[in-house]
Amino acid sequence: MGKYEPPYTISNKMLELVSSISEKVGKISSHRELEARPHLRKNNRIRSIHSSLKIEANSLSLAEVRDVINGHLVLGDQKEIQEVKNAYAAYEKISEINPKSMSDLKKIHGIMTYRTVGESGVFRKGEEGVFSGDRCIFVAPPPNMVNELMKDLFSWVKNSEGTIHPLIMSAVFHYEFVFIHPFADGNGRMARLWHMVMLYRWRNVFEYIPLESQIERFQAEYYDAIAQCHVNGNSDVFIEFMLSMIDQALDEVILQVNKTNESMSEYVKRMLEVMEYDVPYTANAIMEALHLKSKDCLLYTSPSPRDA
């Protein structure tokens, strides 16, 4: 039996998007201050987690997700709260994960679904399908095929390293993973996380890119692309969709960085570095974070409405 090759065809649109993304990643990487901003990394990670869970119908708000991650008391559904804790723990492992390891996949799934599903960290033992109301619109491969299909997929990733661009490979993996539906629950969250892990291994700037938030904005199109691929029997539509999402997410980051560099004073840049996204701050809290001695200093360093 020959090596497994996921069906897809490289298009001119894919090549154009890969070129555009590569250029934008280079621009962002040249702004070395991104790497020195742990608050930016954490804020974007919180956004990623909130969006990925929201896609799967978790009802907690961005502020509530942040509070859970920061250890504050949140009144809400306990399963949803546990999902946030699990997702944060899983995302914190990104730099340690080997994206070519099936054992790592199961281990991270065990973290992602801790205390929320019965079959945690193991491939599913039952049939799975996708329903629209009472109508089944997709039937996943039978459970006795899952292990072999996942072995084939990971073998393809290993054998294709260096010959297939990571931007293409990660999108193909994402779709194939969703098609196989290897776990009883958490497949969407794991597919999006593994996509990010593969991108991070290519360029670590993706640690700061909340791609999941872009997907959440275009959630209907995300599922439409997957459904079209099921019908077409290849992942072409999904590859183009995901490359477009990455390209747009990078545009937002570049605009953010350019605006900061062009219009903000050094003190304001410091404020942005220490302040968390979507969190209200008192003057005293900002003074303490910036080591300022008086509110006069704070007023002098604050951005004008034009800069905000």
Could you tell me what each predicted segment is?
Residues 1-302, 306:
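FIC/Doc superfamily catalytic core
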